[in-house]
From Swiss-Prot:
Keywords noted in UniProt: Activator, DNA-binding, Late protein, Transcription, Transcription regulation
One GO term of the biological process aspect: biosynthetic process
Protein name: Late promoter-activating protein
Gene name in the database record: lpa
Spans through the membrane: none
Domain of life from the UniProt record: Viruses
Listed GO MF terms: DNA binding
Keyword Transcription regulation: yes
Function: Trans-activating factor involved in the late regulation of the P1 lytic growth cycle. May be the transcriptional activator of all late P1 functions.
Species per Swiss-Prot/TrEMBL record: Escherichia phage P1 (Bacteriophage P1)
Length: 150
């Protein structure tokens, strides 16, 4: 299943490296069984304005292949592996661009600097020491008061 040209236009404006969209688009159009090296060479000619790296193409092909939104034939009998993409649900692309939804507490922790994280981890120890010192002071104060009464 191919995406419409509007999605492609959006993708071309916002990047300079090859994306999964261009890889899937070409593979679905041609229905060919290709290795990452062969595909990278073809994509360099198809998209001269984009940076095409063989390793990047291979990693993106693997990501598409293991996705539950794709139908991909992988030929493991040869090295390098060869891939043939039969179909790809647009949900694959929507999932990768969707904003991550984290709990607010976890989101704050993700945005903390290392110093803030260390202070936050150290805070219970500081509170425990203050509580222990307070209890010890009260014990000394009341301990002296009871011994003076006896």
């Amino acid at each position: 299943m191919l995406l419409n040209w509007q999605g492609r236009h959006f993708m071309e404006i916002n990047h300079s490296r090859i994306t999964s969209y261009e890889i899937a688009d070409y593979m679905i159009r041609t229905k060919s069984l290709l290795s990452a090296k062969e595909l990278a060479a073809i994509l360099e000619k198809e998209y001269p304005h984009l940076d095409v790296d063989k390793r990047d193409v291979y990693l993106r092909l693997k990501a598409i292949a293991v996705s539950k939104y794709s139908s991909v034939l992988i030929d493991d009998s040869t090295r390098p592996r060869r891939f043939q993409i039969h179909s790809l649900n647009p949900e694959f692309f929507r999932r990768s661009r969707a904003p991550r939804r984290f709990d607010e507490k976890l989101q704050n922790e993700l945005y903390m600097t290392q110093d803030e994280k260390e202070r936050r981890e150290h805070q219970p120890w500081v509170m425990a020491r203050q509580l222990f010192n307070k209890v010890a002071r009260q014990h000394r104060h009341y301990g002296n008061a009871t011994s003076a009464r006896i």
